[in-house]
C-alpha cells in the first residue's frame, strides 16, 4: 500500500479525493515514468514517491490507465503475503497495510473510499456524460 499524490487535482476523475491517498500496488511489476512521458498522448496525473506512477490519462482525457489495484478487496494483499510466506519466499510486508506495519495486528484498509470515488467519477464524468446516446456518434 503506497501513498499517492494527485498532480492534476482539477481533473474530474479526482473530484472528492483527498490531496494524498493510498492505493494497493503489485510488488512484481513496474512501469517507468520515463517510458510513459516519452509518449505525447499520455500524461501522468497521479504518482507516489515510493511506488512511482499510479494513474495516466490518454487520448484527449477519455482513457485512464491505473497502475495500482484500487479494486483489491481488504484481504487480497494479506492472502498474497501469506501465500508467498508458505511457499518459502521472503516477501516484503506490504507497506501501510497492517496496523503499525505488523501482520499480527490486523489490516488497516485505507483505499476503499478512493477506489469507490475513482470508479463513480469515471462512470459519471467520462462515461455517462461524455458518451453520445447513439453509440455510432462516438469519435
Per-region residue spans from a language model:
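Pocket-forming structural segment of enzyme catalytic cores
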Residues: 1-76
Amino acid at each position: 500500500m503506497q501513498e499517492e499524490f494527485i498532480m492534476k487535482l482539477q481533473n474530474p476523475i479526482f473530484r472528492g479525493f483527498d490531496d494524498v491517498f493510498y492505493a494497493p500496488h503489485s510488488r512484481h511489476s513496474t512501469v517507468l515514468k520515463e517510458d510513459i512521458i516519452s509518449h505525447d498522448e499520455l500524461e501522468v496525473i497521479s504518482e507516489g514517491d515510493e511506488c512511482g506512477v499510479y494513474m495516466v490519462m490518454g487520448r484527449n482525457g477519455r482513457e485512464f490507465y491505473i497502475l495500482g489495484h484500487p479494486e483489491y478487496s481488504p484481504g487480497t494483499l494479506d492472502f498474497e503475503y501469506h501465500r508467498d510466506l508458505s511457499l518459502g519466499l521472503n516477501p516484503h510486508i506490504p507497506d501501510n497495510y497492517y496496523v503499525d506495519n505488523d501482520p499480527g495486528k490486523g489490516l488497516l484498509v485505507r483505499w476503499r473510499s478512493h477506489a469507490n470515488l475513482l470508479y463513480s467519477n469515471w462512470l459519471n464524468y467520462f462515461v455517462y456524460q461524455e458518451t453520445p446516446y447513439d453509440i455510432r456518434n462516438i469519435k
